[in-house]
Amino acid sequence: MNELIEKAKVLQEALPYIREFHGKVFVIKYGGSAMHDEELRESFARDVVLLKYVGINPVIVHGGGPQISKTLEKFGIKPKFVGGMRKTDEETMHVVEMVLSGDINKDIVALINRYSGEKIYAVGLSGRDGRLLKAKKLDKERYFSELGLPVPEEDIGFVGEIVDVNEELIFTLLSHNFIPVIAPVGVGEEGEAYNVNADLAASEIAGEIKAEKLIYLTDTKGVLDEKGELISSLSKDKAEELIKKGVIREGMIPKVRSALRALEKGVKKVHIIDGRVKHSILLEVFTKEGVGTEITLE
């Protein structure tokens, strides 16, 4: 009986959050261990379906770096990185698109649909479908300068940045009870494909559709302080300060930068959470304590 009472308390705790976020859009960047561990995959899918059934509209953007590297090696192509970004020549771009749009995307769609029932369906999209993600070649000078990193001289190939999002397509799908699952492959003016960083894609999509929340699933607890302890709440100014001090460093810098960009474009809150924790999305969104770092403008 006590266990049942505790479960009831959990539902009661979630109620005000369900009421507050009903009808709102959450963009979720899906990556890391949550994509590979079977229990975490199932936990993620169930969480996404639950969000939809309680009236929240999830939009999923996924990565796939490790799978791309493995597939390139199978084809005898050695993965190359320039300044931490995958050098994407034409041959590599074909593999990137094949893995992201054809393999990973459809696997995630099937996973969510396993739990979604008869009224809700996940649908897979590439950024090239319906010109969902219009892109151009990444301005590497601006990108690396903003991160405080030296600008590499080597050409990065078909690495892109998003210049426009087909909001109408996303909202049409959401209004018809679909859960969009988006592969971060952009389309250029001439129809060429671009490899877009999934964090940046999620940030741009969230900003353009003015999402209530942008949630990053990661393989870390969140943003950590000087002692390695989790920072539960972070403002834009504090984030900038921690970047300058070197507390926020390495791979967390571009993630936080993309979070700040989303906030500046109208997203209410960004959450960087530990995707290694089962049901981390629900714990972050529907409990007072949360399980990651919440980032806001002020």
UniProtKB/Swiss-Prot annotation:
<keyword id="KW-0808">Transferase</keyword>
<dbReference type="InterPro" id="IPR037528">
    <property type="entry name" value="ArgB"/>
</dbReference>
<feature type="binding site">
    <location>
        <position position="195"/>
    </location>
    <ligand>
        <name>substrate</name>
    </ligand>
</feature>
<keyword id="KW-0963">Cytoplasm</keyword>
<dbReference type="Pfam" id="PF00696">
    <property type="entry name" value="AA_kinase"/>
</dbReference>
<dbReference type="InterPro" id="IPR001048">
    <property type="entry name" value="Asp/Glu/Uridylate_kinase"/>
</dbReference>
<keyword id="KW-0547">Nucleotide-binding</keyword>
<keyword id="KW-0055">Arginine biosynthesis</keyword>
<dbReference type="GO" id="GO:0003991">
    <property type="term" value="F:acetylglutamate kinase activity"/>
</dbReference>
<feature type="binding site">
    <location>
        <begin position="64"/>
        <end position="65"/>
    </location>
    <ligand>
        <name>substrate</name>
    </ligand>
</feature>
<dbReference type="GO" id="GO:0006526">
    <property type="term" value="P:L-arginine biosynthetic process"/>
</dbReference>
<comment type="function">
    <text>Catalyzes the ATP-dependent phosphorylation of N-acetyl-L-glutamate.</text>
</comment>
<comment type="similarity">
    <text>Belongs to the acetylglutamate kinase family. ArgB subfamily.</text>
</comment>
<dbReference type="InterPro" id="IPR036393">
    <property type="entry name" value="AceGlu_kinase-like_sf"/>
</dbReference>
<feature type="site" description="Transition state stabilizer">
    <location>
        <position position="29"/>
    </location>
</feature>
<comment type="pathway">
    <text>Amino-acid biosynthesis; L-arginine biosynthesis; N(2)-acetyl-L-ornithine from L-glutamate: step 2/4.</text>
</comment>
<dbReference type="GO" id="GO:0005524">
    <property type="term" value="F:ATP binding"/>
</dbReference>
<keyword id="KW-0418">Kinase</keyword>
<feature type="binding site">
    <location>
        <position position="86"/>
    </location>
    <ligand>
        <name>substrate</name>
    </ligand>
</feature>
<dbReference type="GO" id="GO:0005737">
    <property type="term" value="C:cytoplasm"/>
</dbReference>
<dbReference type="InterPro" id="IPR001057">
    <property type="entry name" value="Glu/AcGlu_kinase"/>
</dbReference>
<dbReference type="InterPro" id="IPR004662">
    <property type="entry name" value="AcgluKinase_fam"/>
</dbReference>
<protein>
    <recommendedName>
        <fullName>Acetylglutamate kinase</fullName>
        <ecNumber>2.7.2.8</ecNumber>
    </recommendedName>
</protein>
<keyword id="KW-0067">ATP-binding</keyword>
<dbReference type="GO" id="GO:0042450">
    <property type="term" value="P:arginine biosynthetic process via ornithine"/>
</dbReference>
<dbReference type="InterPro" id="IPR041727">
    <property type="entry name" value="NAGK-C"/>
</dbReference>
<keyword id="KW-0028">Amino-acid biosynthesis</keyword>
<feature type="site" description="Transition state stabilizer">
    <location>
        <position position="255"/>
    </location>
</feature>
